[in-house]
């Protein structure tokens, strides 16, 4: 069954004019929601993501509660890695921990390939369930970017400085580029499968790429990103790029064959556009503001919207994920304000 969906988010991704600014929030599904916390008392992240009905419920929850204009699939960026031979465990309070970190070209050569229908059928089944029976807004599929995935695979888990990752990149370029190629292949196959299952847009998260300078990005990372976006672009859905602490890289992203440049709060929207970012833009509220009084939030959001609405192709989002401490009522109120304020301004 083909469902009719609200396409405001997709229109903004394509740089088209919209009646109001669409909004969704990174990590909108999860830790700040009482319903989610009750589910987590019974089920682990692994159990939720491997149960299509439960995962679909968690994914749809913020759409119903906050009236956001897009859903993003509830899963972890590490989800596809076990399929290629990476032993990943998500440890509470730590994050992803990998027992077999990459240390050599031989380690890279041992990595396999992903077959999504066989390796992650539960993810594709969740997408099909959401897009055929549950959602009235577009579903965003996603993947981690090769650099961020590689950083976990080399460090063995989260890192504050990524010294091992960058040392490997500099000292073992042959192994590094082999790893980038392997991960690019995986990301391409993984995203295409999500789109074929029903995702209407995809976002690539490069959470830790801000640790790399522009020159190194161009040499060691950008070629893989160019290949990913060029291949996935053939699927005909909008593609979004997002990283954290990476304001120095936005022009590099703008050069990629993508549709939307995601910004965090460190770079004002008007400054990004002044630097030459003329594609659609997504962002860029500091999630810390969500813990402030409403009067403070409202004035801050007005400023972001006034910058974003100066040209078509703007999607409101946070610069990073929702904190567990955020009151869900604040997010609901925020979405209503974004819609109403932007509708009034755009109608002038």
Curated annotation (Swiss-Prot):
<feature type="binding site">
    <location>
        <begin position="27"/>
        <end position="31"/>
    </location>
    <ligand>
        <name>substrate</name>
    </ligand>
</feature>
<comment type="pathway">
    <text>Porphyrin-containing compound metabolism; protoporphyrin-IX biosynthesis; coproporphyrinogen-III from 5-aminolevulinate: step 4/4.</text>
</comment>
<feature type="binding site">
    <location>
        <position position="152"/>
    </location>
    <ligand>
        <name>substrate</name>
    </ligand>
</feature>
<dbReference type="InterPro" id="IPR000257">
    <property type="entry name" value="Uroporphyrinogen_deCOase"/>
</dbReference>
<dbReference type="InterPro" id="IPR038071">
    <property type="entry name" value="UROD/MetE-like_sf"/>
</dbReference>
<comment type="function">
    <text>Catalyzes the decarboxylation of four acetate groups of uroporphyrinogen-III to yield coproporphyrinogen-III.</text>
</comment>
<keyword id="KW-0627">Porphyrin biosynthesis</keyword>
<feature type="binding site">
    <location>
        <position position="76"/>
    </location>
    <ligand>
        <name>substrate</name>
    </ligand>
</feature>
<protein>
    <recommendedName>
        <fullName>Uroporphyrinogen decarboxylase</fullName>
        <ecNumber>4.1.1.37</ecNumber>
    </recommendedName>
</protein>
<keyword id="KW-0456">Lyase</keyword>
<keyword id="KW-0963">Cytoplasm</keyword>
<dbReference type="GO" id="GO:0006782">
    <property type="term" value="P:protoporphyrinogen IX biosynthetic process"/>
</dbReference>
<feature type="binding site">
    <location>
        <position position="320"/>
    </location>
    <ligand>
        <name>substrate</name>
    </ligand>
</feature>
<keyword id="KW-0210">Decarboxylase</keyword>
<dbReference type="InterPro" id="IPR006361">
    <property type="entry name" value="Uroporphyrinogen_deCO2ase_HemE"/>
</dbReference>
<feature type="binding site">
    <location>
        <position position="207"/>
    </location>
    <ligand>
        <name>substrate</name>
    </ligand>
</feature>
<dbReference type="GO" id="GO:0004853">
    <property type="term" value="F:uroporphyrinogen decarboxylase activity"/>
</dbReference>
<feature type="binding site">
    <location>
        <position position="46"/>
    </location>
    <ligand>
        <name>substrate</name>
    </ligand>
</feature>
<comment type="similarity">
    <text>Belongs to the uroporphyrinogen decarboxylase family.</text>
</comment>
<dbReference type="GO" id="GO:0005829">
    <property type="term" value="C:cytosol"/>
</dbReference>
<dbReference type="Pfam" id="PF01208">
    <property type="entry name" value="URO-D"/>
</dbReference>
<feature type="site" description="Transition state stabilizer">
    <location>
        <position position="76"/>
    </location>
</feature>
<dbReference type="GO" id="GO:0006783">
    <property type="term" value="P:heme biosynthetic process"/>
</dbReference>
<comment type="subunit">
    <text>Homodimer.</text>
</comment>
């Amino acid at each position: 069954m083909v469902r009719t969906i609200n396409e405001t988010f997709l229109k903004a991704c394509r740089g088209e004019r919209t009646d109001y600014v669409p909004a969704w929030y990174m990590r909108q599904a999860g830790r700040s929601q009482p319903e989610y916390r009750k589910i987590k008392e019974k089920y682990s992240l692994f159990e939720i993501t491997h149960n299509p009905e439960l995962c679909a419920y968690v994914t749809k929850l913020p759409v119903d509660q906050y009236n956001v204009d897009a859903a993003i699939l509830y899963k972890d960026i590490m989800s596809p890695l076990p399929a290629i031979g990476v032993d990943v465990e998500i440890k509470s309070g730590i994050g992803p921990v990998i027992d077999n970190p990459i240390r050599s070209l031989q380690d890279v050569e041992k990595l396999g390939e992903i077959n999504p229908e066989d390796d992650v059928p539960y993810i594709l089944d969740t997408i099909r369930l959401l897009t055929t029976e549950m959602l009235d807004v577009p579903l965003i599929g996603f993947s981690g970017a090769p650099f961020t995935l590689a950083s976990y695979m080399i460090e063995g888990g989260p890192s504050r400085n990524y010294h091992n990752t960058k040392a490997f990149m500099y000292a073992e370029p042959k192994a590094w580029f082999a790893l980038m190629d392997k991960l690019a292949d995986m990301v391409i196959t993984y995203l295409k499968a999500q789109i074929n299952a029903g995702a209407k847009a995809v976002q690539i998260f490069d959470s830790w790429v801000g640790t790399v300078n522009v020159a190194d990005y161009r040499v060691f990372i950008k070629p893989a990103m160019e290949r990913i976006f060029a291949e996935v672009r053939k699927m005909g859905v909008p593609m979004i790029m997002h990283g954290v602490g990476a304001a120095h890289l936005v022009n590099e992203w703008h050069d990629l064959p993508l549709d939307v440049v995601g910004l965090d709060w460190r770079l004002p929207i008007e400054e990004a556009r002044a630097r030459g970012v003329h594609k659609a833009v997504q962002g860029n509220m500091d999630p810390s503001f969500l813990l402030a009084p409403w009067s403070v939030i409202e004035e801050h959001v007005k400023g972001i919207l006034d910058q974003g609405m100066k040209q078509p192709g703007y999607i409101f989002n946070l610069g990073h994920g929702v904190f567990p401490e955020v009151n869900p009522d604040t997010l609901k109120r925020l979405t209503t304000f974004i819609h109403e304020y932007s509708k009034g301004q755009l109608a002038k």
